[in-house]
Amino acid sequence: MAEPGIDKLFGMVDSKYRLTVVVAKRAQQLLRHGFKNTVLEPEERPKMQTLEGLFDDPNAVTWAMKELLTGRLVFGENLVPEDRLQKEMERLYPVEREE
């Protein structure tokens, strides 16, 4: 089943390939930082119904697509280099290392 808003997402990019790359990179960032770096407000977060109740959906791709739909993420050329951005993200949202 297609995600709601997929047509709007396709309209935001010049190709399906670019959309795939943008969503995948954002999903990777969300997973790396435990979703602490999301731009979604609590009431906007994707939900999943389980037998125990309604919980945040653990699917990072769904979160990334929903974030793009809000228009609060910037993607494209001439942005901060990815390595510099990664260092800043690690400073803001430290990754807990398993020992």
Curated annotation (Swiss-Prot):
Pfam families, sorted: RNA_pol_Rpb6
Protein name listed in UniProt: DNA-directed RNA polymerase subunit omega
GO MF annotation list: DNA binding; DNA-directed RNA polymerase activity
Organism per entry: Thermus thermophilus (strain ATCC 27634 / DSM 579 / HB8)
Keyword check for Hydrolase: no
UniProt-listed NCBIfam families: rpoZ
GO biological process: DNA-templated transcription
Record's subunit section: The RNAP catalytic core consists of 2 alpha, 1 beta, 1 beta' and 1 omega subunit. When a sigma factor is associated with the core the holoenzyme is formed, which can initiate transcription.
Key words, A-Z: DNA-directed RNA polymerase, Nucleotidyltransferase, Transcription, Transferase
GO cellular component, one term: DNA-directed RNA polymerase complex
